[in-house]
Amino acid sequence: MIDEIRKDAETRMKKSIEAFRAELRKIRTGRAHTNLLDHISVTYYGTEVPLNQAASVKVEDARTLSVIPFEKSMVPEVEKAIQSSDLGLTPTTAGTVIRIPMPPLTEDRRKELVKVVRSEAEQARVAIRNIRRDANSDLKELLKEKEISEDEERGGEDAIQKLTDKYTGEVDRILQEKEKELMEI
């Protein structure tokens, strides 16, 4: 019983970390990386599809992405989708290749992004603490139904707290890496 609650809490905490990482991948640093365009979608034969299903995205160099739509007719559609995204990018098209230079981030923009990253980290920490609360309330429920002893409940709560500390520490470590990445010029 206690082990199941602990395993469930750990699985949910891992998912929170993955969701946090996914959110951070969407935040533009000064470097080019293919994940940057993951959340952009284009209209492909009347259906909204993720950009990576309508074009190949490659890193040309540290500050340039190249996007090659699978069909020539999609070039203007893809270019428009990139321009209208919230990333502030200006693509240039040469034939079927769309090049996206990464403009360097201004100091103000870097500070704004650090605030966004910290906010995302706090949301991840809150999610992890909520998982701890749920697990602890499950343990209390088992105690109330006399399925476990008070000592077992305390041991379970300690195990859940150790998991919480481990995963909030992971959030802090990821946050520090991202802040460092954002602040380097």
From Swiss-Prot:
HAMAP family the UniProt entry points to: RRF
Biological source species: Alkalilimnicola ehrlichii (strain ATCC BAA-1101 / DSM 17681 / MLHE-1)
Function as written in the Swiss-Prot or TrEMBL entry: Responsible for the release of ribosomes from messenger RNA at the termination of protein biosynthesis. May increase the efficiency of translation by recycling ribosomes from one round of translation to another.
InterPro entries: Ribosome_recyc_fac, Ribosome_recyc_fac_dom, RRF_sf
Localization in the cell: Cytoplasm
GO biological process: cytoplasmic translational termination
SUPFAM superfamilies with a match to the protein in the record: Ribosome recycling factor, RRF
Keywords of the record: Cytoplasm, Protein biosynthesis
This protein's name: Ribosome-recycling factor
Gene3D superfamilies on file: 3.30.1360.40, Ribosome-recycling factor
Recorded superkingdom: Bacteria
Lineage: Bacteria, Pseudomonadati, Pseudomonadota, Gammaproteobacteria, Chromatiales
Similarity-based family: Belongs to the RRF family.
GO MF entries: ribosomal large subunit binding
Gene name per UniProt: frr
GO cellular component: cytosol
Principal location: cytoplasm
